[in-house]
């Protein structure tokens, strides 16, 4: 129906299922928060800390995993990551203390970086004019793993006693990951003509062609470290106390030192190359991925943030029950199965830049009007606005990653890692801002940021889409 070859279809389905399973594993704790709290005698604050730990390492992991994917190929990296996910799931299911849970949820954050591996695999097997559709299906269906974990794992746990139900359910997700690791390695090879000679810079620097791009790369890296610093600050009593204030500042200083070291590495790596002529097959503009990273920080960051706060917003604004608010709030999340592939499909047919302009503008308007919603508005109007906002931004996710692989194919993994990391950075920043402002102001802040991203799109250069022979 979509014009994919048999090999392309097999690759797509094997890869989105691999991504789906990493998300099931990544979110396998959420359905059992209350159960774990009661069984192990944890406080609500400790559960909240574990939820934060679940995403702390995802930001750097996406860049590191993207780099490894460019270097070693997606087949090996995804298979290895699935094995790692399985091992962490099993050790998590055996944990008997807060410390054991803490270490395992930190490690599970690495699994959340698996998204970028599939972006590279799809980019290698699909032509440019079908890239958006394929990437949208991969990401849209794979992301559904988070929702699948929420409604399926409790059903598995119900088959066993309360004491061991959650442990068996979470260990089962690990077993699935391990089985799929072998299936993926056996049946989903890299393309035969992978280029092994493109410099991928394992230390994390992008190969750029000008000092302007080198300066821009240095600027773009800071928010990633900044988000990690913000995590540490939140764990020192703002609002959770896991570490002392002095230790938090020491860790922040250490992160800043690593950031400076990374910048020095970038300059050492690139300065000798800038003076040399750039082959046509390696030429690209770093501003392209910088702008798309801003887009994804908006579309994906907003998605995660609004999913987290929207049920509470409905409950307090319209005085409805917790159950009804949760059910209505889920409407924002479930559009991903259709909207993200739809955004990629539209990009394939009407162009990447044009599609992004329309989707960002639509999300801007929707969230601005959400900021006007109060108890005097009909509940149905708020739901409709949220659905429109969800569709525009989730389709924006698909349109964004329809464009990322077109910048420089040999660096798709690393570029997907950077854009993906920015998505998590956006979520961290939005949720932090939410703790300081009203829900109405929060939605307007999203709209204001969308306006800035909309302006940045004017600097996005057209993408060259090549058709297959």
Task: Explain the meaning of each model-derived region.
Residues 83-96, 362-376:
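C-terminal ends and interior cores of transmembrane alpha-helices
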Residues 29-30, 221-249, 253, 287-330:
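Extracytoplasmic gate region of multi-pass secondary transporters
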Residues 104-141:
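Cytoplasmic helix-loop-helix junction between adjacent transmembrane helices
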Residues 146, 334, 408-439:
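A late C-terminal transmembrane helix in Major Facilitator Superfamily
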Residues 41, 73, 94-99, 111, ...:
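Helix-breaking motifs and short loop linkers at transmembrane-helix boundaries and internal kinks
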Residues 99-107, 380-389:
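Paired small-residue
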Residues 138-195, 202-255:
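Helix-loop-helix hairpin linking two adjacent transmembrane segments in secondary transporters
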Residues 71-82, 348-361:
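Cytoplasmic membrane-interface "Motif A"-like loop-to-helix N-cap segments
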């Amino acid at each position: 129906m979509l014009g994919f070859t048999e090999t392309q279809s097999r690759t797509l389905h094997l890869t989105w299922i691999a991504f789906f399973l990493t998300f099931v594993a990544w979110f396998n704790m959420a359905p059992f928060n209350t159960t774990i709290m009661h069984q192990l005698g944890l406080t609500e604050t400790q559960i909240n800390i574990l939820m934060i730990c679940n995403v702390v390492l995802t930001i750097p992991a996406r860049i590191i995993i993207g780099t490894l994917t460019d270097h070693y190929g997606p087949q090996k990296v995804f298979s290895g990551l699935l094995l790692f996910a399985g091992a962490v799931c099993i050790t998590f299911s055996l944990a008997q203390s807060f410390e054991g849970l803490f270490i395992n949820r930190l490690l599970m954050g690495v699994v959340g970086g698996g998204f970028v591996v599939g972006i590279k695999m799809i980019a290698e097997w699909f032509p440019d004019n079908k890239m958006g559709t394929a990437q949208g299906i991969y990401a849209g269906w794979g992301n559904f793993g988070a929702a699948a974990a929420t409604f399926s794992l409790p059903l598995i746990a119900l088959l066993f006693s309360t004491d061991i139900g959650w442990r068996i359910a979470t260990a089962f997700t690990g077993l699935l990951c391990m089985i799929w690791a072998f299936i993926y390695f056996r049946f989903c090879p890299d393309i035969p003509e992978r280029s092994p000679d493109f410099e991928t810079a394992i230390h994390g620097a992008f190969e750029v062609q000008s000092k302007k791009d080198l300066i821009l790369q240095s600027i773009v890296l800071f928010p990633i470290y900044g988000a990690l610093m913000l995590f540490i600050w939140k764990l020192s009593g703002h609002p959770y106390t896991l570490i002392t204030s002095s230790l938090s500042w020491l860790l922040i200083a250490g992160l800043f030192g690593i950031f400076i070291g990374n910048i020095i590495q970038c300059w050492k790596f690139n300065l000798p190359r800038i003076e040399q002529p750039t082959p046509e097959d390696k030429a690209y503009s770093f501003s392209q991925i910088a702008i798309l990273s801003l887009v994804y920080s908006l579309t994906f960051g907003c998605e995660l943030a609004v999913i987290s706060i929207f049920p509470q917003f409905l409950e307090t604004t319209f005085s409805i029950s917790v159950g009804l608010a949760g059910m209505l709030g889920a409407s924002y999340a479930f559009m991903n199965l259709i909207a993200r592939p739809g955004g990629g499909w539209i990009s394939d047919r009407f162009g990447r830049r044009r599609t992004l302009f329309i989707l960002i503008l639509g999300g801007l308007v929707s969230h601005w009007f959400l900021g006007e919603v109060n108890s005097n508005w009909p509940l149905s109007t708020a739901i409709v606005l949220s659905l429109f906002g969800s569709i525009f931004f989730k389709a924006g996710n698909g349109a964004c990653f329809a464009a990322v692989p077109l910048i420089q194919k040999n660096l798709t993994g690393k570029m997907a890692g950077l854009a993906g990391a920015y998505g998590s950075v956006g979520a961290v920043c939005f949720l932090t801002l939410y703790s300081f402002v009203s829900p109405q102001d929060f939605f307007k802040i999203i709209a204001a940021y969308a306006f800035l991203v909309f302006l940045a799109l004017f600097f996005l250069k057209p993408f060259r889409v090549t058709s297959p022979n």
